[in-house]
C-alpha cells in the first residue's frame, strides 16, 4: 500500500491500517452489494465511494455483487442501471459482476450443515405467531414448538421445502440460536423461506431462497472480502453475521464494520418514499432531475466528479447527522465554475431594437469561453440590429442601485457595445415588449472615448441567429429541511420545484456539448441539455444557480 499525504482518513481506514500492520491481510478486498430492486441514489454513492475508494487507495480490489435473494422484487433493468451508475461515477469492479445467486448451491449446502449440527430447524408456525413468539425489546422470546425437532426430520422437511412441496408462508428454516437474547436478530432468525417466483438469474431452479443476513456473510466469505462495510442499521446484525461464519465450514472470516448512512436535507432517501413520489406522479420518474437518484442527478447535470467530491467532504463516521443540501450544490457549482464554458441565453425575453444600427447588417463578435481559462478558447457570436434581453434587466425608472438598463441610461451588452434606452413599446396589458435603443459604435471592447462611466453589463442573444429553447428551472423538491419528519411528507413538496420558461439560446450550442456536459449561461446559472431535446427545440435543465439563494431564505 502506498501512503499519500492527502489521503483522507476515518475510523474504517484506521482499522484497515492496523490490520495491515498486524499482518492480518495480504491485500484489502471490499464489495458494494446493492439489491437490484430499485435505482441507486446519492446515499448509495457514499457507500460506492467508500468501498471503491478504499480498494483503490490500498491497491486492493472491490467487487460489485448483486444481493438478488428476493426474486419477486428484482429485475434485470435494475441490474443494468446499477452497473451504469457505478461506471458513470468512475469506478471499476474486480472481474465480472457477481450475484448472490451464484452461490445458491453453496448457501443451501451451508443451511444443510447447520441442520446437521442441530443449529437450524424447519418451523411451520404462522408468521404472525412467529412474530409474537419473538417477544419484545423488554421481554424475551418463546421457543417454537418445532425448535426441538430432530435433525433427521428437519433434513427431510428442508428437502421437501427445496422440492417445492410447500406453499409460500407455510414453513421456513430458522437458525437455532437464543430466544432470550437481548438482540432481536439473534432470536432464531429465519434463514430460508419458500418463494415460488422466477429469478432473473437462476430461472425456476429454486423455490426456496436465503434471507439477506444468511446470504450476506457467506457471500463475503466466499469472495474473500476482508472488510464488509455496512450502514449503522446493520450494527446489531453483526452478531448474526459472526454467528453464521463461526458455525459453518468456511475458511475465510470477514469482519463487518458499520458507518452512518447519508441523511440529506430537502429530500428523502428511503426507497419506500421514493417509490411513493414516482407512483403518485409527484415527479416524472426515477430520473426526474429533482430526485436524489444517481439517474436524476445525472440528468440534472451533476458530474461524477462533483458527487465523488461531495462524498469526500461529508466523510465517514458513526454519527447520524443531517447534511446540508448546500454542500452538494457547492460541489457541482465549484466543478462547473471551473470547467463549464460560458454561453448566453435569455429565459424571459423582451426585444431590444438598436435604431441607429444599419438594417440588414450583421457582425461576428468574439467572446471568451471562460473568463479565467484562456485554454478554453473563444467562440463567435452573431450581432445585429435586434437582440433579446431579459425582461428583468430593463426598467423604465429605477434608483442608482439598479445597474442594468433604464430609460435614458446606458448599459453594456456583454462582449458587445454600449447601448442607451430611448423609448419602449408595450402590449395591451402594459407590459414592455420592445425597448428602442441607440448604440455607441466606438465601444466594442473598450470604454466610451469621452470617458463617461458605464457600470452595468447585461447578457443578450442575437434575434437573427438565436435558437428558441425551453428552460427547466429545477429547485429543491421539498420546502422543509427534513420532509421525512412531517406527518405526510408529500405535503412538504415545494410547489415551485420546477418552473418552465420559453426563451432563446445562443446559436450553435446543440451539437457542441462541452466535455463537462454543461454551460454557465452567464448571469443565470449552470445548464445541461435534457434528453427531451430535439434539434428544432432544445431543452436545457438548470443544474444549479450561480449562488445559494436558499441561504438568504433561511436567514
From Swiss-Prot:
Its EC number is 6.1.1.18. The keyword Zinc does not apply. This is Glutamine--tRNA ligase. One of its GO terms (molecular function) is glutamine-tRNA ligase activity. GO terms for cellular component: cytosol. It holds the Pfam family tRNA-synt_1c. A motif ('KMSKS' region) lies at residues 268-272. The keyword Ribonucleoprotein does not apply. HAMAP family: Gln_tRNA_synth. A motif ('HIGH' region) lies at residues 34-44. L-glutamine binds at residues 67, 212.
Amino acid at each position: 500500500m502506498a501512503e499519500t499525504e492527502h489521503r483522507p482518513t476515518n475510523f474504517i481506514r484506521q482499522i484497515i491500517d492496523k490490520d495491515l500492520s498486524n499482518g492480518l491481510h495480504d491485500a484489502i478486498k471490499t464489495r458494494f452489494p446493492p439489491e437490484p430492486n430499485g435505482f441507486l441514489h446519492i446515499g448509495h454513492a457514499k457507500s460506492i465511494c467508500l468501498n471503491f475508494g478504499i480498494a483503490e487507495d490500498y491497491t486492493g480490489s472491490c467487487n460489485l455483487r448483486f444481493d438478488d435473494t428476493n426474486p419477486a422484487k428484482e429485475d434485470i433493468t435494475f441490474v443494468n442501471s446499477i452497473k451504469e451508475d457505478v461506471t458513470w461515477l468512475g469506478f471499476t469492479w474486480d472481474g465480472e459482476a457477481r450475484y448472490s445467486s451464484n452461490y445458491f448451491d453453496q448457501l443451501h449446502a451451508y443451511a444443510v450443515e447447520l441442520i446437521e449440527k442441530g443449529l437450524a430447524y424447519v418451523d411451520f408456525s404462522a408468521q404472525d405467531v412467529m412474530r409474537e413468539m419473538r417477544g419484545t425489546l423488554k421481554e424475551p422470546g418463546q421457543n417454537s414448538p418445532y425448535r426441538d425437532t430432530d435433525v433427521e426430520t428437519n433434513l427431510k422437511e428442508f428437502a421437501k421445502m427445496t422440492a417445492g412441496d410447500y406453499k409460500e408462508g407455510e414453513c421456513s428454516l430458522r437458525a437455532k440460536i437464543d430466544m432470550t437474547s437481548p438482540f432481536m436478530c439473534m432470536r432464531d432468525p429465519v434463514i430460508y423461506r419458500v418463494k415460488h417466483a422466477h429469478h432473473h438469474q437462476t430461472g425456476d431452479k429454486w423455490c426456496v431462497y436465503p434471507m439477506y443476513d444468511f446470504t450476506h456473510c457467506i457471500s463475503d466469505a466466499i469472495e474473500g472480502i476482508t472488510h464488509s462495510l455496512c450502514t449503522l442499521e446493520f450494527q446489531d446484525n453483526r452478531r448474526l453475521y459472526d454467528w453464521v461464519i463461526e458455525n459453518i465450514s468456511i475458511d475465510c472470516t470477514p469482519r463487518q464494520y458499520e458507518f452512518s448512512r447519508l441523511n440529506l436535507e430537502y429530500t428523502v432517501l428511503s426507497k419506500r418514499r421514493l417509490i411513493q413520489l414516482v407512483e403518485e406522479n409527484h415527479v416524472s420518474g426515477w430520473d426526474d432531475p429533482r430526485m436524489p437518484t444517481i439517474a436524476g442527478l445525472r440528468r440534472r447535470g451533476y458530474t461524477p466528479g462533483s458527487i465523488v467530491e461531495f462524498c469526500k467532504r461529508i466523510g465517514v463516521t458513526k454519527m447520524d447527522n443531517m447534511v446540508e443540501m448546500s454542500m452538494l450544490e457547492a460541489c457541482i457549482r465549484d466543478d462547473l465554475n471551473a470547467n463549464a464554458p460560458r454561453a448566453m441565453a435569455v429565459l424571459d425575453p423582451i426585444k431590444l431594437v438598436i435604431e441607429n444600427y444599419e438594417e440588414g447588417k450583421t457582425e461576428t463578435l468574439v467572446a471568451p469561453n471562460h473568463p479565467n481559462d484562456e485554454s478554453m478558447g473563444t467562440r463567435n457570436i452573431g450581432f445585429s440590429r435586434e437582440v433579446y434581453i431579459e425582461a428583468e434587466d430593463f426598467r423604465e425608472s429605477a434608483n442608482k442601485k439598479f445597474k442594468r438598463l433604464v430609460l435614458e441610461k446606458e448599459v453594456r451588452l456583454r462582449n458587445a457595445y454600449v447601448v442607451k434606452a430611448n423609448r419602449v413599446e408595450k402590449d395591451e396589458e402594459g407590459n414592455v415588449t420592445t425597448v428602442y435603443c441607440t448604440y455607441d459604435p466606438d465601444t466594442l471592447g473598450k470604454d466610451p472615448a469621452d470617458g463617461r462611466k458605464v457600470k452595468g453589463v447585461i447578457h443578450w442573444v442575437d434575434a437573427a441567429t438565436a435558437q428558441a429553447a425551453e428552460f427547466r428551472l429545477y429547485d429543491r423538491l421539498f420546502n422543509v429541511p427534513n420532509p421525512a419528519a412531517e406527518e405526510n411528507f408529500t405535503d412538504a413538496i415545494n410547489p415551485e420545484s420546477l418552473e418552465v420558461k420559453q426563451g432563446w439560446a445562443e446559436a450553435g450550442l446543440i451539437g457542441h456539448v462541452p466535455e463537462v456536459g454543461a454551460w454557465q449561461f452567464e448571469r443565470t446559472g449552470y445548464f445541461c441539455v435534457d434528453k427531451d431535446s430535439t434539434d428544432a427545440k432544445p431543452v436545457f435543465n438548470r443544474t444549479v444557480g450561480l449562488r445559494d439563494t436558499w441561504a438568504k431564505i433561511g436567514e
